Amino acid sequence: MKCPYCGYPDSKVIDSRPTDDNTSIRRRRECLKCGKRFTTYEKVEQLPILVIKKDNRREVYDRDKILKGMIKACEKRPVPIKVLEEITDEIDKRIINSMEREITSTEIGEMVMEKLKNVDEVAYVRFASVYRQFKDINTFMDELKKLLKENETKKEKT
C-alpha cells in the first residue's frame, strides 16, 4: 500500500480487524520508509447487477422497486411493512448471493410471487395480475383456480 505521507510504495500491516458492522476490514499500516502510520479499509467490491426487462432493455437492479411493488399489492391488506421489508431482504440476498451480473425481471417477479403467496393470497393475486399482465377475466380466473387447487392440496395433506 502506497504511503500517503511520503509516497513510498510499501508498508507493513500492524493491526487488522473487522469493522463493527462486519462489512469491511480496518488495517493499521506503517510505512517502511518514513515510519508514519496510516489506516486503510478493505471492502468487497459490489458490482452493479443488471435487470433484463421483458423488452430486453437493461436497467440497474434496485431493491426498492421490489418493496414498492409489494406495498402496492398489499394496499389495504393486513400485512405489516416489516414483513414486506423482510421479504425484500431475503430476495435481495438471494439475488446478490447468486453472483450473477444479470437477472431477468421474470425471475425477480417469480421470487416475489412465491413469497407473497405465503403471506397474503389477495396481495399475491394483485401482484400476479400486474406482473403477468392478465389480458382478461379468464386469465385472472385461471390464476385463482390454480391458487384454490393448491390450497385444497395443502388441506388434504394436513
From Swiss-Prot:
Keywords: ATP-binding, DNA-binding, Metal-binding, Nucleotide-binding, Repressor, Transcription, Transcription regulation, Zinc, Zinc-finger. It comes from the Bacteria. It comes from Thermoanaerobacter pseudethanolicus (strain ATCC 33223 / 39E) (Clostridium thermohydrosulfuricum). GO terms for biological process: negative regulation of DNA-templated transcription. HAMAP family: NrdR. Binds 1 zinc ion. Residues 49-139 form the ATP-cone domain. Pfam families: ATP-cone, Zn_ribbon_NrdR. Belongs to the NrdR family. The keyword Coiled coil does not apply. Negatively regulates transcription of bacterial ribonucleotide reductase nrd genes and operons by binding to NrdR-boxes. A zinc finger (unnamed) spans 3-34. One of its GO terms (molecular function) is zinc ion binding. Its cofactor is Zn(2+). This is Transcriptional repressor NrdR.
